[in-house]
A protein has these predicted regions:
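Short coil-to-helix segment of the ABC ATPase nucleotide-binding domain corresponding to the Q-loop/switch region
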Residues: 100-109
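Catalytic Walker B motif of ABC-type/P-loop ATPase nucleotide-binding domains
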Residues: 166-169
Length: 225
């Protein structure tokens, strides 16, 4: 089985204000080209797990593999590069820089990675925006576009470095049903047309039911996947 991401025996405690065992021996994998969702009540550990899987949180025990490479124990600098190159992330809030144009926002992760010339990055950013049907917004200031458009810009930004996996933490949480449907269809298209792997934390049962697989969490444990 070809896995893009694998977690083995992930364990995590929060130590303040008192000890809380938030993740308990979590093991599962995401296959190449799979669109998986994580569901569970608030406090079940799903967002905490996602932040570990995305390499943003390193305070855990267990092993994490990305593209069959063990990434647990790497330095923050190494992880930053691995994350920027391999993982696209879409949050509930878009985190766009309002004073920048749409195009400039999309370009930022590629500039940080530093593997392409500015001309190549501009070309790639336009391409991602066109793919999401928002190419006409490229020169607009990010503060001037609608909420649904902002989330599509955030997706374009997450895709700029051609990641191997796209992760989402409640990416439709702030959107109405029309824009939520838009985001779902974009994700489905990325899986079907580009073979992208996706892992999305969601409260939206309708969204989750239409993904390839639901990973159900309860009290820090995966109860079904």
């Amino acid at each position: 089985m070809n896995l893009v991401l694998e977690a083995k025996n992930i364990d995590k405690h929060f130590h303040k204000p008192k000890d809380f065992h938030v993740l308990k021996n979590v093991s599962f994998g995401v296959k190449v080209g799979e669109f998986a969702s994580i569901m569970g009540k608030s406090g079940s550990g799903k967002s905490t797990l996602l932040y570990i899987l995305s390499t943003m949180d390193t305070d855990y025990t267990g092993e994490l593999y990305l593209n069959n490479e063990l990434i647990t124990g790497k330095t923050h600098q190494e992880l930053s590069r691995i994350r920027n190159k391999n993982i696209g992330f879409v949050f509930q809030f878009h985190y766009l820089l309002s004073e920048f144009s749409v195009l400039e926002n999309v370009m930022l992760p590629a500039k940080k990675l530093g593997e392409k010339t500015n001309t190549e990055i501009i070309h790639d950013a336009h391409q991602k925006l066109e793919m999401l049907h928002i190419g006409h917004l490229a020169d607009q200031r990010a503060s001037r576009i609608s909420g649904g458009e902002k989330q599509r810009v955030a997706i374009a930004r997450a895709l700029i470095n051609d990641p191997t996996i796209l992760m989402g933490d409640e990416p439709t949480g702030n959107l109405d049903s029309h824009n939520s449907e838009n985001v779902f269809n974009i994700f489905k298209r990325l899986k079907e047309e580009q073979g992208l792997s996706l892992l999305v934390v969601t409260h939206d049962e309708d969204f989750a039911k239409r993904t390839d697989r639901i990973i159900q969490m309860e009290d820090g444990i995966i109860v079904s996947h």
